[in-house]
A protein has these predicted regions:
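Acetyl-CoA-dependent GNAT
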Residues: 2-73, 84, 152
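Conserved acyl-donor/pantetheine-binding loop and adjacent beta-alpha core of acyl/acetyltransferases
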Residues: 25-26, 30-38, 53-55, 123-146
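Conserved acetyl-CoA-binding loop-helix of GNAT-fold acetyltransferases
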Residues: 70, 76-91, 116
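Conserved GNAT acetyl-CoA-binding A-motif
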Residues: 91-104
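Conserved beta-strand-loop-alpha-helix junction that forms the acyl-donor binding cleft
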Residues: 101-111, 126-132
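Conserved acetyl-CoA-binding loop of GNAT-fold acetyltransferases
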Residues: 115-124
Length: 153
């Protein structure tokens, strides 16, 4: 599976995926170029219509995966794993110490995937999702807290 770095302006297909993972438009905008010129977007599929994509931003000693999403009909084909493994490789090649990712504590499948890939639970941001303009319901539960996970080299 080829992972490609995307450095052009994002189109509607990109935004559909980004908002699938994080429905707060203003929050997503803040961690993407041009507001965050250091953000990197990686995708699998076609540039104009990706099957899966992720956004990684630099943080102290590492990278944080701020957003990762796969088209619903393309799930369970290893694309999210491929994207995460690519970000891990990029971080390792740059000599960084770790990669971080956060998700709702109600995101059971995502947590299972991240732990399978070697991420360890690192903390909880209490009430993080309660600041969103619309409630997020996942697996029949209201998303309130964000679980942070880290992969250390």
């Amino acid at each position: 599976m080829d992972v490609i770095r995307y450095d052009k302006e994002l189109n509607r297909a990109h935004w559909d995926l980004l908002l699938q993972a994080d429905p707060w438009f203003e929050a997503v905008q803040k961690y993407l170029p041009p507001q965050n010129p250091q953000a990197e977007v990686f995708f699998i599929g076609h540039a104009h219509k990706p099957y899966a994509l992720c956004v990684a931003v630099p943080i102290e000693d590492g990278l944080e995966i701020k957003n990762i999403a796969t088209r619903t009909i393309m799930r369970r084909q290893g694309m999210a794993s491929a994207l995460i493994n690519h970000v891990l490789l990029v971080a390792k090649q740059r000599g960084l110490a770790m990669v971080e990712i956060g998700t709702s504590t109600t995101s059971r499948d995502q947590i299972r995937l991240y732990e399978k890939l070697g991420f360890k639970r690192d903390g909880i941001l209490r009430g993080h999702f309660l600041s969103y303009p619309e409630p997020i319901i996942e697996n029949g539960l209201l998303a309130k807290d964000m679980l942070m996970l880290q992969y250390k080299f």
